[in-house]
Amino acid sequence: MKVIIIEDEKLSAEHLAAMLHRIDASIQIIHYFDSVKSAVKELANGVNADLLFVDIHLADGLSFEIFSQVEVDTPIIF
C-alpha cells in the first residue's frame, strides 16, 4: 500500500510512519508534505497513493484548502 502523509510536525509524521510500518511492513510512505502549498503543488500532478493521512491544522492553513484546489479520489484519514 502506498501512503502519503501531510503533517507539519516532523516528529508526528515520523511517529505515524513508524506505527504504520509496525502494522504492515509492506506499507510505503511515498511522500511527506508539511504545508498546504507543497501538497497542492505536488498533488496537482496526480495522486499515486492508496491512502492519505492528513493533519487538519498545517503551518500555512487548514488542510481542507488542499482539497478545494486539487481533486483527490484517494481515501483520506484526518
Q: Predicted segment positions?
A:
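The feature encodes the CheY-like receiver
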Residues: 59
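Conserved acidic carboxylate
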Residues: 7
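Non-catalytic signal-transmission and effector/linker regions of two-component phosphorelay proteins
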Residues: 1-2
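A short, hydrophobic beta-strand element within the central beta-sheet of small alpha/beta folds
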Residues: 74-78
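Acidic, metal-coordinating helix/loop segments flanking the phosphotransfer/catalytic sites
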Residues: 17, 32-51
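Active-site residues of response regulator receiver
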Residues: 55
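Acidic catalytic/metal-coordinating carboxylates
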Residues: 62-65
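Two-component/phosphorelay signaling modules centered on CheY-like receiver
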Residues: 10-31
